[in-house]
Amino acid sequence: MDLIKYFTFSMIIFILGIWGILLNRRNILIMLMSIELMLLAVNLNFLVFSVSLDDMMGQVFALLVLTVAAAESAIGLAIFVITFRVRGTIAVEFINSIQG
């Protein structure tokens, strides 16, 4: 198992996630997908180093991150649906003006 290949692949995925956030500042849904891409890269790092070090803690952390990411996505998508129903858009400019 070549760690450099997996680490490079994970780094590319993480950079693509950062790039997606920085390039697209208007659509909040694409920003959420980019954050999920970054979490995927972190999970891949946890799993690769867990297998290479013969330690189960990396796999446990990866499962923990997956469950938190699933909950985050569900809550975020629910907020987006409610915002779209009330305002008619999920653009970042209009979400920033929400008060209350």
Swiss-Prot record:
The reaction(s) this protein catalyses: a ubiquinone + NADH + 5 H(+)(in) = a ubiquinol + NAD(+) + 4 H(+)(out)
Pfam annotation, one family: Oxidored_q2
E.C. numbers: 7.1.1.2
Molecular functions per Gene Ontology: NADH dehydrogenase (ubiquinone) activity
Topology in membrane: Multi-pass membrane protein
Residues passing through the membrane, by range: 3-23, 28-48, 62-82
Cited function: Core subunit of the mitochondrial membrane respiratory chain NADH dehydrogenase (Complex I) that is believed to belong to the minimal assembly required for catalysis. Complex I functions in the transfer of electrons from NADH to the respiratory chain. The immediate electron acceptor for the enzyme is believed to be ubiquinone.
Gene designation per UniProt: ND4L
Subunit details: Complex I is composed of at least 49 different subunits.
Domain of life: Eukaryota
UniProt-recorded name of the protein: NADH-ubiquinone oxidoreductase chain 4L
Keywords: Electron transport, Membrane, Mitochondrion, NAD, Respiratory chain, Translocase, Transmembrane, Transmembrane helix, Transport, Ubiquinone
Similarity field: Belongs to the complex I subunit 4L family.
InterPro entries, alphabetized: NADH_UbQ_OxRdtase_chain4L/K, NUOK/Mnh_C1-like
Cellular component, GO, one term: NADH dehydrogenase complex
Signal sequence, renumbered to the chain: none
PANTHER family in the record: NADH DEHYDROGENASE SUBUNIT 4L-RELATED, NADH-UBIQUINONE OXIDOREDUCTASE SUBUNIT ND4L
One BP annotation, GO: ATP synthesis coupled electron transport
Subcellular location: Mitochondrion membrane
